[in-house]
Amino acid sequence: ELVVVFQQDLPGYLDGVKTAIEQNDNEGIARTAHILKGPLGTLGFFTAGALALDLEVMGRTNNIGEASTSFGTLSKELAKLEPLLIELSGDKSLATDAD
């Protein structure tokens, strides 16, 4: 069930981080990346979780110069995880667009 909820919420989290980056919103980057980091760790997606942590730290330290690049890396990592998420959820209709 956690996988299904995560898949449903993932596009919103990614949109939130992307929007915060576009608006140079340090707090928004940190907050949304922190929210995203939790389920990534719970599901065992440690590389993606570490990338979300990097974004969170960038936001908290007001050092978002590389946030766009880090977000791109996180998006690519999540795209690689999509087949596993679909397999774990058993529901192909929940495929996400991590771009």
Residue ranges and their predicted role:
Residues 51-60:
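Hydrophobic, amphipathic alpha-helical faces that serve as interaction scaffolds
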